[in-house]
Amino acid sequence: MNQTGRTIGGPQNGVNTVINPFRVSPSEDRVSSRDETPRNYNNPFLNEDDTRRAHNSSVSNSRQERLPSYEEAAGTPKQQAPYPKEKKRSSGSNSHQHNHHHHRRTSHGHRDKDKQKSKSRTKVKPPKNVDTIDKMDVTGLFGGSFHHDGPFDACTPQRNKNNKVAPVLAFPADGPNNTVGGRTSKKSTLDEVFGRETVDDDSETLNQLQDRAYLFNKANSSTTTLDAIKPNSKNITQFDSKMKTELVHGPITMGLGSTTFLDGAPASSAAIEQDVINHAQESRRKNSIARKKSLPSRRHLQVNNNNLKLVKTHSGHLEQKDVDDNRTSVPVTATQGSGHEDVVKKENTGNKLLRRVKSLKTSKKH
């Protein structure tokens, strides 16, 4: 077949050859059919390179058509071989290596033991039958040397081991420690709102005083605590710590109220009377040796004595005060000799001068 599509010759060697009118190279002249028999590459129109290329393509096509075998998929025997071992050393090196491995094993064993010991040290074993109060007891070297009956037993009384003197019985509800406070006078807001409050404060105070008087010197009705502390003792009296005694006031100062008793407590009336008597006795002893006064001077002193009054000063001492002249005299000196009292009066210098002038005028007239 020529370039127009005609067949040039018949079949050669059993291969149907068809000339491609669009061929570029002589290798394209030969177009194989799908059901052709084994090819003959002795084509006089093909050169050596075209023949080799055609052979390789046919081989690759045949390989693609069939599945790979197990050996091809698994690889070569060299690839399947394990990793080569190290070469064995001499006998001396073997012993050294054995010792080295043994040393490693022993070191690992020691490390494991040390770790176990450290863990056992950090983990503190809690003592048995020990609560928080037992741990707080510093008398025991390692804590919890013995069990204490403490506040936990108030919530769990069944834990109490000592039934005679137990901490639960230290403050019973009706014991003396819970009744010392007395009645409180705190007002309730609800009582005021609903009208349950007593309006009269005096009656409320009176009721409180009556209750206190009733509770005073009353024997304690609780026998549990008393029998636990002091058996067969029922003479403990009850007292009220809020009862106030009568305050004793001293001399009143200007703007400061009563004194603070820094110089001692104020004297009683009986002590003041006894002090006056003692001063009178001392003055009588001193004046017993002195000259007796004349009768006119005694009369003058008796008249002035009627106008004198005992006055308590700021310091607490007694002084004489003249009502008419508002003159203050020296402390009282009373004598009980001839039936009258001699009082030495302190006079101002101005009064003495006036009296002297009056006496001179009267003497000139005579």
Swiss-Prot record:
Tell me where the cross-link Glycyl lysine isopeptide (Lys-Gly) (interchain with G-Cter in ubiquitin) is found: 78, 187, 242
GO cellular-component terms in the record?
Answer: actin cortical patch; cytoplasm; nuclear periphery; nucleus
Bias category Polar residues: which stretches? 328-338
List keywords of the entry alphabetically: Cytoplasm, Isopeptide bond, Nucleus, Phosphoprotein, Ubl conjugation
- The keyword Cytoplasm belongs to this UniProt entry's keyword annotation: yes
Stretch list, region Disordered: 1-135, 313-366
Q: Where is the composition biased (Basic residues)?
A: 97-108, 353-366
Q: List Phosphothreonine occurrences by residue.
A: 76, 189
Q: Where in the cell is it found?
A: Cytoplasm; Nucleus
Q: Which residues carry this modification: Phosphoserine?
A: 69, 288, 294, 359
Record carries keyword Oxidoreductase: no
Q: Where is the composition biased (Basic and acidic residues)?
A: 26-38, 316-327, 339-349
InterPro entries to which the protein is assigned, alphabetical: Pal1
One Pfam annotation reads Pal1
Q: Which family does it belong to?
A: Belongs to the pal1 family.
The name under which this protein is listed is Uncharacterized protein YHR097C
Which taxonomic lineage is given here?
Eukaryota, Fungi, Dikarya, Ascomycota, Saccharomycotina
